[in-house]
Amino acid sequence: MRYLSLPILLFSSLFLTACGPAALIGAVGSAVTRTAYENDAKVNDYSQPAGPRNTLEVALANLKLGIGYMNEGLYEEALEKLNRAKEAEPDYPPTYNALGVLYQKLGVYDVAEANFKIAIKLNPADSSTLNNYGLLLCQSQRFEEADEIFMKAANNPLYATPEFAYSNAGTCALNNEQTELAENYFKEALRRNARIGPALIQMSELSYEQEKFMPARDYLSRYLDSNKHSAKSLWLGIRIERELGDKNAVSSYELLLRNQFSESEEAKLLSQAL
């Protein structure tokens, strides 16, 4: 299983140009409702059509709401808000970036690509959009095109988080069975940011597959320093510690996998392996 870091890319960098890195719009809780988002927007009432407003303010308010809805899986509401943002400011690149991600989530890849291309045409140096477009290309198995786009994003000297581009390029290379290239990309991602989770877990998996069990353990340990366990990380830990002969660690990982992810495919694999 390969680990793409799409959510990180969209929601951590979409607003860098317009609002600065502190303007992240993330999930506001597990039970967010349409009313809650609308009330939040009405602090400045910028998402409402009545009265003369600065069009960029209207676009930003609706864009933030659209991403909030997208985080919650409320795609119909997200599309409504993003279309309002586009109507208010038709040449604002981040709106098309968000629309691209939304249509990708909906599986409408041709419309997603069209929106990414508009965003890139409006702002060719936006590495966030390039990164998200690269993910779409990789998902569509257009690996060479994806690699070119990821490297364009990574080589932008103004891009604050090139490690995400390298990590995604590594994942895409793995999907294209280019293991050596993938490893080089993951190592470059970790050189830029030693704590980037997707690269750490992929390097742990690669090290395990290469029977380098001590490095595999080290990469997994570093991953867990800043990331919560998943079914995948626990199953990987079980396999690594079995090879290293640490029965206590194996038992601990197995217990966590059974208790926390009992319905996962990894838990089923564990049952089959016993």
What residue spans do the PLM features occupy?
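Terminal, low-structured helical/coil segments at or just beyond the last alpha-helical repeat
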Residues: L24-A31, Y37-A50, Y223-L274
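Residue-level recognition of tetratricopeptide repeat
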Residues: V58, Y92, D126, A160-P162, ...
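Structural marker of alpha-solenoid helical repeat scaffolds
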Residues: N54, A88, L122-N123, N156-L158, ...
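TPR alpha-solenoid repeat register
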Residues: T95, T129, L136, E163-A165, ...
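Canonical tetratricopeptide repeat
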Residues: K64, N97-V101, N132, Y166-N168, ...
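Register position in tetratricopeptide repeats
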Residues: N71, K105-L106, Q139-S140, N175-N176, ...
